[in-house]
Every structure is written in C-alpha cells, then in structure tokens.
Amino acid sequence: MTSWVGRSAVEIAAAVRERRATPREVVAEHLDRIARLDGRVGAFRRVRAEAALAEADELAARGDLAELPLAGVPLAVKDNLDVRGESKRNGSAATPDTPAAADHVAVARLRAAGAVVIGLTNVPELCVFGTTDGVHGITRNPWDLTRTAGGSSGGSAAAVAAGMAPIALGNDGMGSLRIPAANCGLLTLKPGYGVLPAGIGGGDWFGMSENGPLATTVADARLMCALLAGSERRWPSRVPPTGMRKVAVSLRSPLLGVTVAAPFRAAVREAAGVLIKAGHQVRRADPPYPASLATTSLTHWTAAVAVDAEGLDPRLLDRRTRTQAAIGRRFLKGVRASTARDTLRRRLEPFFAEHDVLLTPALARRSPAAEPWHERSWLRNAAVNSACSPLSPPWNLTGWPAVSVPFGVLPSGAPCAVQLAGLPGSEQELLDVAAEFERLRPWRRTAPLD
C-alpha cells in the first residue's frame, strides 16, 4: 500500500484528483501518525479526528474533486486562527472556550481548495514568544526532541516536520513563522504587508503580522500563497527567473550586542558559494540597520501584546505574558504615533536599490531546551528571544517579505537555515532563489521519528 506520509501537498492532491488515493485514506494515515507520535512532539492542541474523516468523505463525493488544487490534503492550523466549530485558545487559559461561527478567511480559502483541517496546533500564550510551551504543553523539535520547536508557530512547524501534516498555516509577527521553520527544517515565507489576508489579533500587531505557509517544498509554499491570495490578486505574478541576481550577504546581527554563532555563519557562507556557482553576483554587504532597531522592536513587540491582552483576565495569564502586556501599555501611545518604521524603510531602501536579495542567517543560535519557559520571568524569555532570533524583526517592522530556507545541518544533527529578504513585491523572486537551493542542495523533508 502506498504511504502518503512525507509526500508533498502537490503530490497528494494530484493522487486524489487522479483517484489514485481517496481523501479518507490520506487523512486517516496522517491521523494515525499523530496518534502514534504527537505524545512525544506536542504539536497539536486539538486533533479533529472524527470531523476530519467526515469532511474527507464529503470531499470525495464532490463533483469538482478533480479540479481542486489541494484535494484531500491534510492541513494543520495555528491556534490563533478561527476554524468553524472549534474554539480558538491562542495558547491561553484566559481566552474564551467558544466555538468559532466561521472560518478565518485564510482557512476558508485553503478549505475551498480541497484541504482538510486535521487539527489546531500549539502556540505560546498570545503567540508572544520564540518557544512553544504553556497550558497546552511543550512543543518539541521533531529533529531534536530535547529542544523547542521555536515559536510562535511552533506547533504548526512541528506537525509538518514530523510528517503529521504535509502543510500548515501559521503567521509571523516577529519571526513566528521563520523561527520554527528554521528550527524544524521547513520552507516558509513571511509575505510583505497586504499581500495575503491577515486578520490576526488586535490590528495585526500594528500591521507587522502576516499569515503564511509552512511546507517541505517550495512548490507547496508557492501554491498555498497563491490560494491564500484568492481573487484579490495581490500575490505577485510569477515572472521567469532573470538569471543573475545581485545578492548581498550579511553575517551581522541587526541587534547590537547579539552575535551569530559559528555554524549559522558557516551555513550562510556555504549558501553564498552555491549562488556564486549558479551564476549570481554575490558580495558581502551589511544593511545599514540603525542602532535604535532594538528599541523599536521592543516597543512594538510589547505594545502589540498589550492590545491582544485587553479584556483578558490577567489572573489567568502566564507571568511572562502579564509582564509583557504591562510593559507594552507604557509604550502603546508612543507606538501608535511612531514614525520609526517609516524611517527604517527609508534607511534600507537605498541598500536594496543596489541588491535584489539579502542573504543572512535565519537564526543566531540553536533553539533553547524544550522546557517550561512560560514559568520563567519575562526578562529571561526576552533575552532568549533576542539571542536566538535577532534577524527576524527588521522585516516585520518594514513590512517587507522574507523567506526561511533549510540549508545544511547543525553539529547536533538538527537542520540549519538561511534567510532571504527583499523589497515589497519580491515574494516570487525570493521563492525562486529558495527553489535554486532546493534543487542544488536538497534538504531532508521529514524527521526520522519512527
């Protein structure tokens, strides 16, 4: 019997459309894998076993099955997005346990394309931190179960890396897609502002947070983005690759005082070598990050959480979340009036006038141990976030696209990754470069948990 675990969404959908597999067969096999492995990984907060099988049967009876781009593909959804009939807990005991009346638009579009939602994935409380743990347990990296999967889309990333779902939906407010993708060996895109529908929390974290895909292949990520864009046609049209691109390579952390560990610098150097051999014009060049970037990141990050915590019982929040919200309330008025993000864009635009793509490390060091970080102080959590993922915030603050691409392996055996960033509208170009890495340096797609 053919196994569909570890196959891409494109492969699965083609098999279902061609009647080589049924939606029930595909969904049931992934549910079985969840039942066997998720006790070790902790990817899911809620598994929709009966509902998913029923929806798979309904899908099989549709007359347009042969036309659906994601026919029968199991989909994991981050637990801060509405799924009809399911409660959205956002990693917290303080949020209402009330079933959603309708799907979030991003979920609805993927379902309309034939995807079957198999479960809601774990997040840190209010999707704040770079480790996924809290009232719903600890989410571990399937490649190294002693380490966190990262956050805040940690459950979604762990589900895909463990082969429990071929694709997942997550979002990124300060690296929340790219951090867990880099830890778990996945491909992800944080799109630019307004490219894909957001609608995440209170004001999308001042427009910094975007929905996006977690996938094992560039083709799956590209397909998800095209479907998420829907009829709004904001997804950039794909143009044929133009051949040589001007690629800037930077090993520098944007945050002063934070250094990038040697294995992550080495991965970028090796990735640059791959691009040189592929015919691109590659040179070392550091973006002119301002010294104030750390302050801008901190004020916007904490203020966004203050907005999301409004109306929630503080007694039910984790200590680190309460502290973050309290700090953010002090900055809220200033952030709403701030022009710091416009200043950052103006500062970086001349750099990208000279370069098509920026290549950097995706992370500065390996992910922290899989431990109850939610029981520790806010300061300790913030310090770990800054130390591990200083290269994510600039692209949320600017609202520009960034991609995390698996590249190489760390000394521990866990995946390593690089980051690609560009100007607004460069999403397809960044994915084209990611596809070159995929072709020239293919990565392992599923963690060997069996």
Predicted features along the sequence, with ranges:
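Acidic/His- and Gly-rich active-site-bordering loop/insert found
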Residues: 52-54, 62-135
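Immediate post-signal peptide segment of exported/extracytoplasmic ligand-binding proteins
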Residues: 59-74, 220, 240-248
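Glycine-rich, small-residue loops and helix-cap segments
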Residues: 19, 30, 72, 112, ...
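Short helix-loop capping/hinge segments that flank enzyme active sites or metal/cofactor-binding pockets
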Residues: 70-90, 244-250, 299-349, 361-365, ...
